[in-house]
Amino acid sequence: MDEEEIKYFVRVRNTDLDGTKAVHIALTGIKGIGPHTSRTITALAAVDPHAILGKLDDESVGRIANAVDTYTEQVPDWMVNRQKDVYTGEVRHLLGTDLTMMNDDDVNRMRKMRSYRGIRHETGQKVRGQRTKSTGRTGTTVGVKRKKD
């Protein structure tokens, strides 16, 4: 490839990635892949993480896509985002809309079983034990009103 020839959008796992960024940064554009996971994927694909994604040849992009697809089989169980799935019991790494739908299903399951966390989700309150007396208030502020003379 010439120096000027660059693909501005690279399609990986049904997501358009920014071709002007480094590989390890561009991969974080896929929901479910963070900085640590993207570094691991570039190592599995044998691609320089600091290379510009749009300048890579199709074979390298294919290796990256293959590493993303086979990520679960190549890393330990503690490195995936869905360990011991509630329904199937398997270890999976969810990406994109699958991750969003599974999170919504988990919240709905907690609501249906009326667990403490489910009730907090239902009422729109904080779920993870944060303080609620002074922070997280919604609505308009009243402020200080003067007394009528």
From Swiss-Prot:
Q: Which InterPro entries match?
A: Rbsml_uS13_C, Ribosomal_uS13, Ribosomal_uS13-like_H2TH, Ribosomal_uS13_archaeal, Ribosomal_uS13_CS
Stored SUPFAM superfamilies: S13-like H2TH domain
Key words of the record:
Ribonucleoprotein, Ribosomal protein, RNA-binding, rRNA-binding
Ranges for region Disordered: 122-149
Gene Ontology, cellular component aspect: cytosol; small ribosomal subunit
Gene3D superfamilies xref list: 1.10.8.50, 30s ribosomal protein s13, domain 2
Answer whether the UniProt record assigns the keyword Transferase to this protein: no
* Superkingdom per UniProt: Archaea
Assembly behavior: Part of the 30S ribosomal subunit. Forms a loose heterodimer with protein S19. Forms two bridges to the 50S subunit in the 70S ribosome.
This molecule's function is given as:
Located at the top of the head of the 30S subunit, it contacts several helices of the 16S rRNA. In the 70S ribosome it contacts the 23S rRNA (bridge B1a) and protein L5 of the 50S subunit (bridge B1b), connecting the 2 subunits; these bridges are implicated in subunit movement.
Record-linked NCBIfam families: PRK04053.1 (NF003140), uS13_arch (TIGR03629)
The family classification in the record reads:
Belongs to the universal ribosomal protein uS13 family.
Give the protein name, as stated in the record. Small ribosomal subunit protein uS13
Q: What organism is recorded for this protein? A: Methanoculleus marisnigri (strain ATCC 35101 / DSM 1498 / JR1)
